[in-house]
Amino acid sequence: MAEVRPPGLFRRAWRWLFSPSPRWSVFALLAIGLLIGAFGVIGTGVAVAVTGTSEFCGTTCHSHQQFVYPEHQQSVHYNNRTGVRASCTDCHVPHHYPAKLIYKAKAGMRDAWAELRGTIATREKFEHERWRLANNVWDEMRENNSENCRSCHNPTAMSSAKQSEDAVKQHKKFAAGKATCIDCHTGVAHKEPEEPKEPAKAEAPK
């Protein structure tokens, strides 16, 4: 009686490809994985789109609806002669992936926790925190060389004939890498905060 030889490597791989387990083939598992991945990509895209509107940012939190969003609606970034409107995410959220998703997740959790704690729940609390909050944003912008500003404003496309002498001088510094947008343009989308007179941190209102 001839000896039965075990199947070769190629045959074993072929069998495993179609039946890695008694219940599922590799192709079935791949199809399920692709389906889950597709739902994940579509779901993420929908979530980013829904949470990326100014209406969502400005009205979801009570404090934003009461204090932050109305200021933005009165700014030149909301109403202007050209009709070009900058949304909250245009200025505050990175425009590229995966940085956009990471920032939105971190900022969402941070803002939700602050809202639950009532950090800026009243006008008095908001004004007390305004300087600190503004500087946090300005520091972020300086770190990335005002990347979000430059996604709309291109210094090489600016007409020096339509700018003041000082603006032309400052924009030359910017083009040379010696300055960044936020060094000069603070208070363009929200009220300019007043620097605290006392260097020591004042007690937060209760």
Annotate each PLM feature.
Residues A2-K206:
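Short sequence/structural segments immediately N-terminal
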